[in-house]
Design a protein with these regions (language model features):
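AlphaC helix of the protein kinase catalytic domain
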Residues: 2-12
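Activation segment signature within eukaryotic-like protein kinase domains
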Residues: 20-21
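Protein kinase catalytic-loop region centered on the HRD/HxD motif
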Residues: 25-36
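Canonical protein kinase catalytic loop motif
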Residues: 37, 42-43, 47
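Activation-loop N-terminal segment of eukaryotic-like protein kinases
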Residues: 48-52
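Regulatory activation segment
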Residues: 54, 66-76
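C-terminal lobe helix-coil module of Hanks-type protein kinase domains
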Residues: 80-169
Length: 169
């Protein structure tokens, strides 16, 4: 996806990003149901096959999620894509961690901008919604992206099924 975005002038329409990322979200819903977290979702880990089919790569950072979908993990940081809980080794991670990262991928794909780092956002949140940037996207999509990028994990979607539904309301 990173290379594709580079070729497309750094961003694509919401509709095209939805076509690319919906299958990835469905895959991640299944991954989470199996008790795994990816923990490294970013454009450079989404490969577009010649037929346009997206594939999620690099499960090297993935971990089993114990204790009702939550556990502690070593640091895995990708600036702009890592949620606050990945910066603190004592914080719990779960599906909400991957949801934040998917929100960041959507944001990057449609705005052409990598979201500010979560640590920077926790001091003064400079994140501007896609609609506020003047992009022509559905309000549901704008709300869903911003909800996924919420700094508080409890205010994000609980799972990818919920996130998909949020985009479709």
């Amino acid at each position: 996806l990173k290379n594709y975005l580079d070729v497309q002038g750094d961003r694509i329409s919401f509709e095209e990003s939805w076509e690319i990322l919906l299958p990835i979200m469905k895959t991640l819903a299944e991954v989470h149901e199996a008790g795994l977290l990816h923990r490294d979702i970013a454009p450079d880990n989404i490969f577009l096959c010649k037929n346009g089919e997206p594939k999620l790569l690099d499960f090297g950072s993935s971990r089993f999620a114990f204790s009702r979908g939550m556990t502690e993990f070593p640091l895995t940081i990708k600036p702009g894509y890592a949620p606050p809980e990945q910066y603190r080794d004592f914080d719990r991670q779960g599906p909400w961690t991957d949801i934040y990262q998917m929100g960041a991928v959507f944001y990057r794909a449609i705005t052409g901008r990598i979201p500010p780092e979560a640590i920077e956002r926790s001091v003064s949140d400079p994140l501007t919604s896609p609609l506020q940037l003047g992009l022509n996207i559905p309000e549901e999509a704008d709300r869903s992206i911003m909800k996924a990028l919420n700094l508080d994990p409890q205010d994000r979607f609980r799972n990818f099924f919920e996130m998909i539904k949020g985009f479709q309301c």
